[in-house]
Amino acid sequence: MVTKESLTKEVGVLYGKIYGYTDVGGDSVLEFMDEWLSDEGKYDLFMEYINNDEFNEDTSLVEVTELINLLYHILDGLREEYNM
């Protein structure tokens, strides 16, 4: 069963993978991610997670799932950008 807790953990794992690219790309990786999140209207939702290590109670599973899908796209974009 998919729960907000399991989705929250997945967001953390994906962010860890994205953050790992800063070893290669420096701060430009985080700027790339922030810009993409902003363009898709998910920056505030992601910051909610970063600031609290969880999402607010009123955050829906759909919103978190959309964020996860976007983080996968960002990760794919970074892999392509850095040929990894």
Model-derived features: positions:
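Short terminal alpha-helical segments
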Residues: 1-28
